[in-house]
Amino acid sequence: MATKFPSFSQGLAQDPTTRRIWYGIATAHDFESHDGMTEERLYQKLFSTHFGHLAVIGLWVAGNLFHIAWQGNFEQWVADPQNVQPIAHAIWDPHFGQGISDALTQAGASRPVNICYSGLYHWWYTIGMRTNTELYQGAIFIDILVAWLLFGGWLHLQPKFRPSLAWFKNAEAMMNHHLAVLFGFTNIAWTGHLVHVAIPESRGQHVGWDNFLTVLPHPEGLTPFFTGNWGAYAQNPDSLNHAFGTSEGAGTAILTFLGGVHPQSGALWLTDISHHHIAIGVFMIIGGHMYRNSFGIGHTFKEITDGHNTSHPNDPHKDGFREKIGHYGLSHTGITDTINNSLHFQLGLALACLGTAASLVAHHMGALPSYAFIAQDYTTQAALYTHHQYIAIFLMCGAFSHGAIFFVRDYDPEANKDNVLARVLETKEALISHLSWVCMLLGFHTLALYLHNDVVIAFGTPEKQILVEPIFAQFIQAASGKVMYGLDVLLANANSAPSLAAAGMPGDHYWMDLINASPEVSNFMPIGPGDFLVHHGIALGLHTTALILIKGALDARGSKLMPDKKDFGYAFACDGPGRGGTCDISAWDSTYMAIFWALNTIAWATYYWHWKHLAAWQGNMAQFNESSTHLMGWFRDYLWINSSQIINGYNPFGINNLSPWAYMFLAGHLVWATGFMFLISWRGYWQELIETLVWAHQRSPIANLVGWRDKPVALSIVQARLVGVTHFAVGNIFTFGAFVIASTASKFG
């Protein structure tokens, strides 16, 4: 007899309704809730899934390598990266006739193709790849690695090769391994690749499997390293006239501290990047020897956290401190065990860090691009900024979700008595109310300023606008070296201590050249009143998103309205009809509501980045500066003008290469709008509709030839909300992704 899905829950498997299917899917990855699950088995299953996760990533990367080598134009692009458009892949079956086939036969191809806006060409070129053969070799190597990963995942599920629970919970050993091996060695290995392969290739010296053991990356080899003359590796860097990929103007340095960007490629100096990675690698390896493991020396987390409190005999604030300002509690006592025993706490920390890093990458790739010529591929820059910002918001919403699950499932009040976690829970009303106040202040004031400016412009008196200069932000830019504001502070003042120290550094340095360059290549673009207003609009969105998420996590265990909330779990719709006011207050609901605000916020942030850069790239900063001070300017001069090009991807007179984005733009709107159908109508509506459809099905002679085992029932309220927010988010992303790419590509290709 076949086992009914889901095999991990016999209770669900015996459910006679379609609830069996939907709840089975919903809980498939909630390993903690599965039948017969032990803590050790939970860790082992999660450990094994990591191998599968890495394998999926590897297949994705290998697929990119293979398809570009097969269907792209990598070698042609390498020969002229500033003028040849990179091809992502061929389009096998362009629908809608010859017109679309002709429109999509582009970038020198002989058949319909998609243009590549992912930056992969720039990345591979920068790290030293030059031929399709090298791309194929990379794909094959990664596929072999994937096979090993899949084998490793399977192996670690076998009884003899399952790690023990103690192994998973040895935090010191894990931290040493992650710091020294994963981060330390890989950073130094990447420096090795840059020094031995990428930098020689950037200077016209090919390095391949045939000669990488014989080509010296530096004329003096390892002699300066062993003699302590490390400065030799920084001498004779590439000149400002260096033609990337050739020996013209090339130097011999491999580890430099030049600052700024390569004038021709527009990217950070490769020798600066290699220096950056070796420095990080050395620090990480030192850090990887800090924690006590095999030899009984070094720190332990428990000693650090338990010693970090105002009751500890070594606390510097001990004498008289508590008498003056009150007792601070047990601070971090118990925190190590709390984190080490909660996978949700650990995942929350990891997601918060990775989400922040993703947002940092979004900004970094625009302001300080690492890859040769990517700064001049404006559509790719816009696509990558948008991509990484959207990733960031979902990761950070996930961080708070798992923080809330920690409070519901893993938090032990006794183990955390009077420590920082308990203190945060005790002061949650103050935290939440202050955040609420900040949101109202930001929202009302920012909207009022925008609306005032809209009204006075509508009445023909733009001189009556309230325009606030962002003087504090300009001060920060000046401190970093931007001189246009006339603020003589730090690096903007040639006689300040930092400027004199910088001037005293040996060799040439180009940071000041970059920060004071023309706007389209400057990483600190000039800012004014429009920036001030949109900054506060984005701040409103960030604070409101944070308010919803923080409130959801801090109230996850209980609130004045519902003190026993933790007993209902992380996600529940309401506590039945007899207890009013308990709908929409589960911790899951706060994540659900925060996603809408997060999407709003990141749209505003990306609108801002995109419009400002479009204006800079077109040499028309005045348009942004004048139109961004009022809402109609945003609607008319950014959204409407740029949407019009996409909507005309196809029309009664013909079709062009923007048409795929036009279809995506419309389809994204459709998916987005479909979300509201699930968000507004609740479970009863769908149950009645299903029953009507079943009635009609059973009375149709042909349809009734097909039956079903499970009684059809509507999704739960929580599941319907998930369907709604998923449609909203996916539609939002498809709409805006198509908008960004098409509106930029229509101007710059």
Curated annotation (Swiss-Prot):
Pfam families: PsaA_PsaB. The keyword Electron transport applies. One of its GO terms (cellular component) is photosystem I. Divinyl chlorophyll a B3 binds at residues 677, 685. Keywords: 4Fe-4S, Chlorophyll, Chromophore, Electron transport, Iron, Iron-sulfur, Magnesium, Membrane, Metal-binding, Oxidoreductase, Photosynthesis, Photosystem I, Thylakoid, Transmembrane, Transmembrane helix, Transport. Divinyl chlorophyll a B1 binds at residue 669. PSI electron transfer chain: 5 divinyl chlorophyll a, 1 divinyl chlorophyll a', 2 phylloquinones and 3 4Fe-4S clusters. PSI core antenna: 90 divinyl chlorophyll a, 22 carotenoids, 3 phospholipids and 1 galactolipid. P700 is a divinyl chlorophyll a/divinyl chlorophyll a' dimer, A0 is one or more divinyl chlorophyll a, A1 is one or both phylloquinones and FX is a shared 4Fe-4S iron-sulfur center. GO terms for molecular function: 4 iron, 4 sulfur cluster binding; chlorophyll binding; electron transfer activity; magnesium ion binding; oxidoreductase activity. It comes from the Bacteria. [4Fe-4S] cluster binds at residues 574, 583. It catalyses: reduced [plastocyanin] + hnu + oxidized [2Fe-2S]-[ferredoxin] = oxidized [plastocyanin] + reduced [2Fe-2S]-[ferredoxin]. GO terms for biological process: photosynthesis. It is a multi-pass membrane protein. PsaA and PsaB bind P700, the primary electron donor of photosystem I (PSI), as well as the electron acceptors A0, A1 and FX. PSI is a plastocyanin/cytochrome c6-ferredoxin oxidoreductase, converting photonic excitation into a charge separation, which transfers an electron from the donor P700 chlorophyll pair to the spectroscopically characterized acceptors A0, A1, FX, FA and FB in turn. Oxidized P700 is reduced on the lumenal side of the thylakoid membrane by plastocyanin or cytochrome c6. The PsaA/B heterodimer binds the P700 divinyl chlorophyll special pair and subsequent electron acceptors. PSI consists of a core antenna complex that captures photons, and an electron transfer chain that converts photonic excitation into a charge separation. The cyanobacterial PSI reaction center is composed of one copy each of PsaA,B,C,D,E,F,I,J,K,L,M and X, and forms trimeric complexes. HAMAP family: PSI_PsaB. This is Photosystem I P700 chlorophyll a apoprotein A2. It comes from Prochlorococcus marinus (strain MIT 9303).
